[in-house]
A protein has these predicted regions:
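Short, conserved active-site loops that position catalytic residues or coordinate cofactors/metal ions
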Residues: 68-77, 105-111
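Histidine-acidic metal/acid-base catalytic patches
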Residues: 2-45, 50-68, 190-212, 216-316
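Glycine-rich, proline-tolerant flexible connector loops at the mouths of alpha/beta enzymes
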Residues: 74-94, 152
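Conserved beta-strand positions in the central sheet of alpha/beta enzyme cores
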Residues: 74, 106-108, 144, 180, ...
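A short acidic, helix-capping loop that chelates divalent metal ions and anchors anionic groups
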Residues: 79-81, 112-117, 151-155, 220, ...
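Metal-dependent catalytic neighborhoods of phosphoester/phosphodiester hydrolases
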Residues: 83-90, 118-121, 294
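Active-site-proximal loop/turn and secondary-structure-junction residues that shape catalytic pockets
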Residues: 50-52, 77-79, 110-111, 147-151, ...
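Active-site acidic/histidine proton-transfer and metal-coordination neighborhood
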Residues: 14-25, 36-39, 62, 96-100, ...
Length: 316
């Protein structure tokens, strides 16, 4: 059975990993890479969506994530852009993230790389390149690639989705950032794991992978049994949350709750990822106004981590 070995554990103990002994003093990037190779392991990440209601800047988000004890952070591109536009230094932001013991596990962007119109798609691909460059400059190696721009409208053939995803992966490979094909359960396109898996396989690119979300698996009707078919390389980041007993046809993004406060089969999801051998960053993603009214930012940040750890600790 796999274990939950975080990057912090690696740095602190010099634990054996992936067939090699990790020694204290090795670089943060080396320790992170080793943690990512731990079969059936989990790391803990703050998707800054959890804090959006507080309207904090990226530096405040980093401080909260580091102070709470997360292993990584998943910022929104818009927040990084706002920081840079106001005169902030990206190299300095990269250092601050590392100084707080964090890695940039992923980033949230909405480039319309998938759309049908060729001209708009070219613009979307160029936007994605700019955003991936930004991610690279702050030390990140992954970015979300949701079906932005194709939420409504006609269904796009999966062969075309695969072709467009490959183009996105090739753009990312030149930069050193992997685009993760994200499932949006409410969208007309790429709303199910099976659709995303087909496109990722058909893309025929070694970096192809999926970005999944507990809520979106339910919303899109994917279910959870299909996760057993995914390889250990398929899911490098998983958006963690829970949801109440609302029919999937009516449930919305804002209804997501903290792990353990809903009815999602979290043990099944996490056990499957572990059995598959995935080394996955669990990234808490919730947009619940009720929490923003009930808790201050520091408390909610800590709760997100505590609830994810509790979910993993409950696995057999």
């Amino acid at each position: 059975m796999g274990q939950t070995l975080t990057r912090r554990d690696v740095l602190r103990t010099g634990a054996a990993s992936a067939g090699a002994t990790l020694l204290l003093g090795r670089s943060l990037s080396e320790a992170t890479a080793a943690a990512e190779q731990q079969v059936g392991s989990f790391r803990y990440c703050l998707n800054t969506a959890l804090l959006r209601g507080y309207r904090l800047g990226i530096l405040e988000q980093v401080e909260l994530a580091g102070g709470a004890g997360y292993d990584g952070i998943e910022p929104w591109i818009a927040d990084v852009q706002k920081y840079a536009a106001s005169g902030g230094s990206l190299p300095d932001l990269k250092r601050r993230i590392a100084d707080r013991g964090l890695v940039v596990e992923s980033a949230i962007g909405f480039a319309p790389w998938i759309v049908e119109d060729a001209g708009e798609r070219a613009k979307g691909l160029e936007q994605a390149r700019r955003e991936m460059e930004l991610v690279s400059q702050i030390g990140g190696k992954r970015i979300a690639a949701p079906p932005a721009g194709a939420v409504e409208g006609p269904a796009i053939p999966l062969s075309a989705v695969a072709e467009r995803y490959r183009a996105l992966l090739e753009a990312g490979a030149a930069i050193g950032v992997v685009a993760q094909l994200e499932v949006w359960g409410f969208a007309k396109n790429v709303s199910r794991v099976s659709e995303a898996a087909y496109a990722a396989i058909e893309a025929g690119h070694p970096d192809a992978c999926l970005l999944l979300d507990v809520y979106h698996l339910y919303k899109g009707g994917s279910g959870y049994q299909g996760l057993r078919q995914l390889s250990r390389q398929a899911v490098r980041v998983m958006h963690m949350n829970d949801y109440p007993a609302i029919p999937r046809e009516r449930i919305e993004d804002k209804d997501r709750v903290l792990p353990g406060e809903g009815v999602a089969p979290l043990s099944e999801v996490l056990s499957t990822l572990r059995a598959n051998g995935c080394a996955t960053a669990l990234s808490i993603e919730i947009f619940n106004e009720g929490y923003w009214k009930k808790y201050d930012a520091k408390t909610l940040t800590a709760l997100g981590l505590e609830r994810m750890r509790r979910a993993v600790a409950g696995l057999r």
